Amino acid sequence: MKSHKDMTMKRHFCIWSTALLLSLTATAQTGAVYDSDTTAIAARRYAAATPWDITDTDKDVFDTFEGLVRTMGLEEGKTADLSDEAEIAMPEPRLAYVNLTGITDIPTSKQRQLQAWMEMYDGEGRYFRKRLLVKAQGGYSIRFPKRNFSVIFCNENWEEEDTPDFSIGDWVRQDGFHFKAFYTDFMRGTGEIGYKWYRQMVADRLPFWERGGYYNESRALCVPDGFPCIVYLNGKFLGVYAWQLKKHRRNMNMKKATAEHVHLDGNVNDLYLFNGKVNWKQFEARNPKQLYTSKGEPYDGNYPSELIDEKCKGFYNAEDSAEVREGKERSAKVKQYILRLSGYKKELAAFEREGEETLKRELEKRFDIQSLLDYQVFFRVLMNGDGTLKNWQWFTYDGVKWMVAPYDLDQTFGITLYGFPRPATHTLSTITSGPFTFISRYYAREEAERYAELRQKGVLSEEAILPVIHDWYGRVGTEWYEMEKRRWPESPCYCEAVCNDGWKVCDDWSIYNSTPNYDEYRTYRAGDICVLDGRLWEATKRVTGVFPYVRNSDIDTLERMVAWISERLNVLDEYYGYEPGQMAVQRPAPDTVSGKEEGIYTIDGKRIPQRRKGINIVRYGNGASRVIYQK
């Protein structure tokens, strides 16, 4: 049997080596835990009364929030209790710790909000306990046993009015957040890694809103961002989550009463919008706010429907208040902007008949080409197979020119909906929804140039992405990953595929696009191959009506993901005809731009007062930018 001293040293070494608890060897920090009556007990008193003592029976001390708090060696006066603060500003935690109480489980519905309490400790001396409303979050993922959830902090009456505002790191102020489970993803944060990489990709571009003619200083990202978080439910370990920014107007730098600031989310594609017919139930107008439906009722994004305009009964109602009248007029404007967007593809098809030059000129009046090219390159690099129909955001700042940005990146880096990875050599079909039809036809050169530019700058490189991957993995740490695996052993990324008798997995991905789908009425003979649920299956004997698999999954690892990046870039170098070492596409030199330097930025888009060692992005008054390497 191991000695108490050996076990203690082993535990501490594991914690330190994985950056699990950052401050154990520095000054002690305090927090708070609660008894069954939710009465605050100062953690310093609890720790003093029950000193940490690892034994064989309590080695899983981190399984409970109480054990976590006790383990962190808390002392009086070392923690800032922010529970009573209306506004909280804090650096982004490397790893946060959250305990939800007042509910028995994570909700299963996005429509029903539950009242709960949240305790948060940032691992660096800050703590709070606040009321919040919690509901399920996500689409397909809502059926997984480990679910995403959304929280909105509320006042003492459980209302969303006068709610506390949080400023975390460089994020915009928010009063609510998403907590992403990433159940099929072994990193429990692959999507967050993708967003961070995308921000590096577009760091040399002007902000989206300025490209749309709206000039208002903001820290908005126009895509989510997140940091790792350990979540407990009623004191018991629930899992590793990502604490993430919501799709909120502040993160889009939009005003809720400005009709031209339109943000669409959902099934925005040829089937429901771009081909001239609008299915209003398939997507949500997230901004502006205070909209009204064609029936004169307040617009509800959970149940989207057609917006009101002058042709609708009830648009003119003498009993409407000034606020309602304003909302209806705003709705009519937004509706016209969306209808106009719906007709763009037909208009552009007509211009296409007049020639490429005319088509490009008209396309660039209607869409931000930079965002389309960046999205296309990003789509191909990360193999974002779920980002061509609904998991993207479409938005405009003037009601005329639209742009696109990614959202929901859980199926990237080869990871599929079912959790098994696809090889980096696997190809994706071309995006054809909306304006991408014309991007694929007429902007192949510009797309290849953008890819080459990003490769030359080092943004699309192993050196740029691997530190982001390793940073996330290190912030969570191997011990928490082991706990996650014990808590959710059926997670697809932890399990090998299980085939029914007569079938086996086929790994020849080169034939995927030419292989027919599984047909339950067909008789398959040994060697016959079919596609089902994103994977190839090969019959090992004569079978009819036998489903190929019991469990469609595969074990995934950090090593697989790291190797995938290198191989994927090699594949795309060949696809785009890029040769490492070729000259990058040049931005205008300082003497060819008009105006003074607008600002200096880091590679991930943060403004800095002066150039730093390494890569700097210098922007000029006319919108041009240069990448400068400072020795």
Question: In which residue ranges do the predicted regions lie?
Answer:
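C-terminal tail/sorting-segment detector
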Residues: 11, 617-631
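Regulatory N- and C-terminal appendages and interdomain linkers associated
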Residues: 27-137, 477-507, 553-582
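Conserved ATP-binding subdomain of kinase catalytic cores across diverse folds
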Residues: 123-306
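Active-site acidic catalytic loop and adjacent metal/ATP-binding pocket
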Residues: 151, 365-416
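Tryptophan-rich substrate-binding surfaces of secreted polymer-degrading and adhesive proteins
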Residues: 497-564, 570
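Residue-level detector of functionally pivotal "anchor" positions at catalytic/ligand-binding pockets or at interdomain
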Residues: 577-604
